[in-house]
Amino acid sequence: MARDTAILRVTGFVQGVGFRYTTKHVAYKYDVSGTVKNLDDGSVEIHAIAEEENLNKFIDAIKKGPSPGCRIEHVYIYKGAPVEDRKTFDIVY
């Protein structure tokens, strides 16, 4: 099956609250590969690759806030964006 891609930029209180760690667990749950990393402006960027249904479920889970300590202000979603093909989901430091 074809896999879809998306880049998500998540703003709000999303750094220092376990957001990347819990995002990785959500990615495993929905069989999503890609990366998650903190950006210098305080936001988090996610590169995601998965079958369409799983990618949509992953995005919905991110919008709800995977970490109990986070507060999501906005999730910018760029579907179909070019993303490096990966077999795993990794935290980028």
Curated annotation (Swiss-Prot):
Question: Pfam family of this protein, just one?
Answer: Acylphosphatase
Q: Report the SUPFAM superfamilies cross-referenced here.
A: Acylphosphatase/BLUF domain-like (SSF54975)
Q: What class of enzyme is it?
A: hydrolase
Q: Name the catalytic site residues.
A: 20, 38
Entry's Gene Ontology molecular function annotations: acylphosphatase activity
InterPro entries linked: Acylphosphatase, Acylphosphatase-like_dom, Acylphosphatase-like_dom_sf, Acylphosphatase_CS
Q: Name all Acylphosphatase-like domain ranges.
A: 5-93
The protein's UniProt keywords, in alphabetical order, are:
Hydrolase
As recorded in UniProt, its EC number(s) are 3.6.1.7
What highest taxon heads this organism's lineage? Bacteria
- Give me the reactions it catalyses: an acyl phosphate + H2O = a carboxylate + phosphate + H(+)
**Which family does the record claim for this protein?**
Belongs to the acylphosphatase family.
User: What name has this protein been given in UniProt?
Assistant: Acylphosphatase
Mind giving the lineage of the organism this protein is from?
Bacteria, Bacillati, Bacillota, Bacilli, Bacillales
